[in-house]
Structures are given as C-alpha cells and as structure tokens.
Amino acid sequence: MQLTELIETTVVGLGYELVDLERTGRGMLCIYIDQPAGIAIEDCEKVTRQLQHVLTVENIDYERLEVSSPGLDRPLKKLADFERFAGSEVVITLKKPLDGRKSYRGILHAPQGETIGLEFEGKEGAAMLDFTLADIDKARLVPKFDFRSRKQ
C-alpha cells in the first residue's frame, strides 16, 4: 500500500477528509485534514496518535509528523471540493494561459459534470471561465475576515 493510500484510509476511517499530504526532505510528514464542521486541536491529536501507530506498524520512515487543518486559504484539489465550496471566492492558477492569463480570482460555481465555472471581473465587466480539474495548477479559497465587533 502506498503512503498516500495508507494515510487516506486511516484519516477517512476516523471520519475526516485528507486534504493534502507533504513530505519534506528532512523527514517531516505534514498531513492536512478537514471535515464539514471544521477541525479542532483534539481532531489533530486523534489523527496524529492513530497515524503514529499505523506508520510504525507499516515501518514507514519519518522524523516528525504534523497534522493540521488546511487553514482559511484551503487548497481545492478534488471535484468534491469545488462542489462543497461553490459560491465562495477562490483564486485559480491554470497550467496554461487562457486569453493571456493564468491567474483568476472570482466566485466559484458548482461543477456541471467535469466542468467547473468561475465568475470573475474581466476587462469588459463580469465574465465566466469554464475549466476542468486537468486545467488547474493551483486553486485556493480566499480567506474571509470579519473584524467587526459582534456587539452593536
């Protein structure tokens, strides 16, 4: 079983989604998990304990294990991510330029089959970009911050 498959099976078995996995040259293994309700420190601890056990049993070599949430600027990698975050503001970087641009920022539309839509501000007003997962180099949510006090 490959490392990604092993980790994903473990993470999903605990009720979380594996968002991303990074392995650095210094033996650091970074795992990013999520779930619809969000991630708390206890969730990271739970996954860390289970992964430490699994990685030891499977004799996977690593120096340090880090489990965390993907953050406010969460990467979008799977079609399900684009569906879940439809209506959110995102930044998309394409592998190849389209109309002289690779980077777009706009409102994500729900996928229609394999096609994903992005409404963005073009040179002549609102425009629509249609693309597939294969066209994307990177896609991330744009963080939303609300600094207004809850008191009125």
UniProtKB/Swiss-Prot annotation:
Pfam families: DUF150_C, RimP_N. One of its GO terms (cellular component) is cytosol. Keywords: Cytoplasm, Ribosome biogenesis. GO terms for biological process: ribosomal small subunit assembly; translation. SUPFAM superfamilies: YhbC-like, C-terminal domain, YhbC-like, N-terminal domain. It is found in: Cytoplasm. The keyword Cytoplasm applies. InterPro entries: Ribosome_maturation_RimP (IPR003728), RimP_C (IPR028998), RimP_C_sf (IPR036847), RimP_N (IPR028989), RimP_N_sf (IPR035956). The keyword Heme does not apply. Belongs to the RimP family. HAMAP family: RimP (MF_01077). PANTHER family: RIBOSOME MATURATION FACTOR RIMP (PTHR33867:SF1). Required for maturation of 30S ribosomal subunits. NCBIfam families: PRK00092.2-1. This is Ribosome maturation factor RimP. It comes from Paraburkholderia phytofirmans (strain DSM 17436 / LMG 22146 / PsJN).
